[in-house]
Amino acid sequence: MSKHDKPLDFLWFIPTSGDGSYLGSDDLSRPADPGYFREIAQAADRLGYSGVLIPTGVACEESFILAANLAAYTEKLKFLVAIRPGVASPAYYARLASTLDRVSHGRLLLNIVVGGSAQELAGDGIFLPHDERYDHADEFFQVFNSLIETGKGDLDGKYIKAQGARLGLPPVQEPRPPLYFGGSSDAGIEFSAGITDKYLTWGEPPAQVAEKIVKVRAAAAKNGREVTFGIRLHFIVRETDEEAWADADRLISKLSDETIASAQEVFSKASDSVGQARMQALHNGRRDKLEVSPNLWAGIGLVRSGAGTALVGSPKTVAARLREYQALGIDTVIASGYPHLEEAYRLSELLFPEIGIDGPRNQIRSSFGAKQVFGGGGHGGNVKLVSGS
């Protein structure tokens, strides 16, 4: 079996700023609720997802605290949690990361978020220009990695000064929890090549993803390193292509042109992220040309910052598109879909069999080789068994 034939590592997403069935509308919306997050995490844990991404930002719940809570209600699920250089010291983040890895029994993944919104960064007390934020992050991780791998850290840097920093308790994972990172600028790619274990890209067309992978591999090779690759995508998978595209249209059916224009203006003014600019360039704020590559739909990015594209289609169609990314070197997918509880089930039931991922964990046999038929029954909602092959 070649590496391109191996099943992809699939993570799901916890929508900590809220969820819903329509973009840009309060109709059928769901507030940010810890109980709901727990439902999604427990479903992902059962359904074959290896982990969940917990987002970060002013509109989101704090990711380390939420991950610690969800770890208590799950068994195997890993948690991809944001570490924000500059928001706290390397020593403090080392203690957070080590403790969370210990209490979750080695289920922590770390997502480096340098930041792309000048307004949000200013609120966190960070005023460095775009490229300097990566210089700062490089010094940050010199101390962080030293602490978490050896228990000691010292640096007299331009941005970070640590004298006699110590970490008393090591993480479970050796030498440390894996570091993930996504950044499309040249500065971001150079930073990733020297620090991270897995480079993440948002869901751009395969040709653009291929260009990024070539750049990251070349930059990593200069540092004597190898980096693996993941992609962040939404999914709209239905039994037929026609059903999937109908639901894609439905997702943005309550969006007004004014809402789209307002969102795009905010994204353009608030962000200096190269990745965000690349997402916006796929659709240019227009809703009439949203299929930017076969089955790659940019409708979500009309009003959502960050990951703005979805793979749309039947299980066979979407599986074929995923194999195209896999052939480029992608081995990990961070997935989501609206609403996230229902779509976690739908993706595992429809797509996972097509891409070789095991289904629900701890599945109990319903009968001795009989087909399941759901019927009303005298007690309501019972399962009748019909024999057959």
Curated annotation (Swiss-Prot):
A Pfam family recorded for this sequence: Bac_luciferase
GO molecular function: alkanesulfonate monooxygenase activity
Gene3D superfamilies for the chain: Luciferase-like domain (3.20.20.30)
Keywords on record: Flavoprotein, FMN, Monooxygenase, Oxidoreductase
Flavoprotein listed as a keyword: yes
InterPro entries listed in its UniProt record: Alkanesulphonate_mOase_FMN-dep, Luciferase-like_dom, Luciferase-like_sf, SsuD_RutA_monooxygenase
CDD domains (alphabetical): Alkanesulfonate_monoxygenase
Signal peptide, first to last residue: none
EC number(s) per entry: 1.14.14.5
Reaction(s) the record says it catalyses: an alkanesulfonate + FMNH2 + O2 = an aldehyde + FMN + sulfite + H2O + 2 H(+)
Single GO biological process annotation from the record: alkanesulfonate catabolic process
Entry similarity comment: Belongs to the SsuD family.
HAMAP family associated with the record: Alkanesulf_monooxygen (MF_01229)
Function in brief: Catalyzes the desulfonation of aliphatic sulfonates.
Protein name: Alkanesulfonate monooxygenase
